[in-house]
Regions:
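Single conserved hydrophobic/aromatic residue that forms the stacking wall/gate
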Residues: 1-8, 12-13
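Active-site phosphate-binding strand-loop segment of PLP-dependent enzymes
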Residues: 15-66, 70
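PLP-dependent enzyme catalytic core of the Aspartate aminotransferase-like
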Residues: 23, 216-217, 221, 233-274
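Conserved PLP-dependent catalytic core of the aminotransferase class-I/II
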Residues: 142-143, 147-194, 201, 213
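Conserved C-terminal alpha-helix-loop-beta "cap" of PLP-dependent enzymes
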Residues: 178, 182-247
Length: 274
């Protein structure tokens, strides 16, 4: 049963993080919680390796799939995932304000929010059965209808097909900017399982200024700053500068990707000459 308690966090980069987990175990450790892929660098987690660690140490295995749900196939039963949380507005193509969670049927979860008794109107306590136990209040039905449409389209197209296209576009962009003078790229592009993200900086220029120029002069929309991931930026040494994040979609074209890469290279030359 999952209830309340203290949570410890640890940031690690690349494969060496798996070797650190053993040392982080405490007598009170109850779960291993991992992100499917970083929203900053795109680096992915080897879920099979993480699952093996969790199972060997009798830990609950919980996955944050905000970046990977809809972008990568995830077999929760094969991996033995106990709980998986996802947002609807990213790769699942749903509206903002939608999302959900998979919870292993035999796992009891104490809800954070309660209210109402569902179809059992005369019960004086919140229902315990799933999924009602975690669905207090009125659901965002309109948003969920949009999410359902997005999921249906993804299944028709094939998640693997779309993921391969996104990975190819991210790789194309990376290959064109990685050797440009003044450009620093973060993340391990050699990973097989990663999000279609390329994060970079140009010299010591503030990432917000780079993003503004890309939008105003080139019509390219990126996200700059900390991306709600302070521990990652501490690990990368980019707390003050932030990073410029390019996120690629299967709706992008190769021409758009090449134009973006050319804009980065041109902007890097301008900044280095200032």
């Amino acid at each position: 049963e999952i209830g309340s308690g203290l949570v410890g966090s640890e940031m690690c980069i690349r494969d060496r993080c798996y070797d650190q987990w053993e040392a982080l175990l405490r007598p009170t450790t109850r779960a291993l919680v991992v992100t499917g892929a970083s929203n900053v660098t795109g680096n992915g987690t080897d879920l099979a390796r993480a699952a093996d660690f969790a199972h060997r140490h009798s830990l609950l295995f919980i996955v944050d799939a905000a970046q990977t749900a809809g972008a990568q196939p995830i077999d929760v039963q094969r991996l033995g995932i106990d709980a998986l949380c996802f947002t609807g507005h990213k790769a699942l193509l749903g509206p903002q304000g939608t999302g959900g969670a998979y919870v292993r049927p035999s796992l009891r979860v104490a809800p954070l929010l309660v209210g109402g008794s569902g179809v059992h109107s005369f019960d004086e306590t919140h229902p315990l059965q799933m999924p009602t136990a975690l669905e207090a209040g009125t659901l965002n039905v309109h948003g969920l209808a949009g999410l359902c449409a997005g999921v249906r389209w993804l299944l028709e197209q094939g998640v693997e097909n779309l993921a391969a296209r996104e990975a190819a576009l991210a790789r194309l962009f990376y290959e064109q900017v990685r050797t440009a003078p003044g450009v620093t790229v973060y993340g391990d592009m050699a990973m097989q399982s990663r999000a279609p993200i390329v994060a970079l900086n140009i010299a010591q220029e503030d990432s917000a200024r780079v993003a503004d120029i890309l939008w105003e002069d080139y019509g390219i929309c990126v996200r700059a700053g900390a991306h709600c991931a302070p521990l990652m930026h501490k690990a990368l040494g980019t707390v003050e500068q932030g990073v410029v994040r390019f996120s690629f979609s299967h709706f992008n074209t190769e021409q758009e990707v090449q134009q973006a890469a050319q804009a980065v290279c041109a902007l890097a030359r301008e900044i280095l000459c200032e």
